[in-house]
Amino acid sequence: MDRSAYSRGVSTIGERRRRPGPTVRDRVTEFRDGARLEREDRVITEEPLELRVGWPGRPAERVAVTMRTPGHDFELAAGWMVHEGITTPRDVRAVRYCTDETLGELEEFNVVTVDLAGPPLTLPAARLVSSACGVCGTDTVQDVLARAEATDPVTLSVATVLALPDRLREQQPGFGRTGGVHAAGLFEADGTRVVVREDVGRHNAVDKVVGSRILTAQRMPPVLVLSGRIGFELVQKAVVSGLGALVAVGAPTSLAVSLAREAGVVMVGFDRGGRFVAYAGAERLRD
């Protein structure tokens, strides 16, 4: 690899302009010691980023859409292109945001093109996109809602919510031996454990528990419990499967919260140490 490529400099067009920050302010409900507290909190920002690649004589082509925290987008794009084998460091000539004037302010910061000196080494799943480019969190949420399974509203007791992480942990032998796997579990609204699966990938663990019900043609329990944080794609899986509540020991992202609220899903994070924070559906949590 040509190490000089890292020091010669690459054109980064528009990255100094104002863009979404890494966190957003939100109103949440904290449950602690039998009390409810409405307060403001900070949530990590999550937005889709469309990655494109262009080279002389060809229009830019979309190669991926990834979820990320805004900031250092050009670094993300350049690193991703090299790591995926699409190009080498020496062939990256410029990185820029989409500048279509018809786009909203947030949309134009969610599309990045990496201009290469010549054709890419490979182009996985490449396809042309329209000139009216743009991708934003609102559109992403609406796309998921269009595929959502109908679900009945779920009501949970505070005591049940507080007990769920421990009930999940009881069925995590892999974590007990290694500390290196995630877990997902499906539970009834009264806290009855139905199925728990582990995997090195939290997304895979969710696929496994949902798949276990699909393959046995059994009813889908309404509550999904996660051992880590809640990203957009995990809420997407829950909504598409018709689940009514997500409970996690970690924090959610901004786009995950938006989708949960739009879909009418109860979302609980930081469920540990005798407390938790409700980001969506707090009105369906009873004492």
Give, region by region, the residue ranges found by the protein language model.
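Short hotspots in intrinsically disordered terminal tails
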Residues: 6-7, 284
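Feature captures the catalytic cores and cofactor-binding loops of soluble hydro-lyases/lyases
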Residues: 202-281, 287
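Short intrinsically disordered, low-complexity coil segments enriched in acidic
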Residues: 1-2, 226
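Intrinsically disordered, low-complexity regions enriched in acidic/Ser/Thr/Pro/Gln residues
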Residues: 2, 8-189, 193-196, 200
